[in-house]
Amino acid sequence: GFSSIFHLFHSHSKIVRKVLVRFDYAGIAILIIGSCYPPYYYYFYCKFNFAIGYMVFITVYGLTVFGVMMAPQFDKPKYMKIKGILFLVFGISAGIAMIQINLFTETIGSFENEPHLKEWYFGGLSYILGAVIYILRIPERFKPGTFCLIGNSHNIFHFMVLLGFGLHFYGSIKAYNYRLDNACM
């Protein structure tokens, strides 16, 4: 919602753009927080203390990112890379649970036992890749002025966030169905 409002009204005036761009990035932080809850909930359903721990962690980090995105002092162009790095670390930290999943289960290198993990992995990679593209300003750094309207790193970042969210959503539906058939042992 926030991103749609920003992209619809950002050319209204400088002040409107300045305020709405904060909501644009802050909304992405909220979206990422929300897309991490189902994987944590369903995967750690039988070890719910882990689920709660990961949910608290991602919420605290995500709200920190939200706060930075909303802070007027970070509006300056010199902080653009720092904001991108915050999103990169956000994507990486959201995937910390995947390390535990691989270390403590029999799913290492295989998605057969837990088919929804594939979507969660690739959703996380999509978040991370989007942040890297945003930080490196690809493709506009190679052809300045060519990608002002469409195809710039900001657009690609949004696309990668939506792709990651969609993959997490699809994986969560698969995990829900998996949980219906596979109760805790």
Enumerate the predicted regions with their spans.
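Multi-pass alpha-helical transmembrane bundles in non-GPCR membrane proteins
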Residues: G1-M185
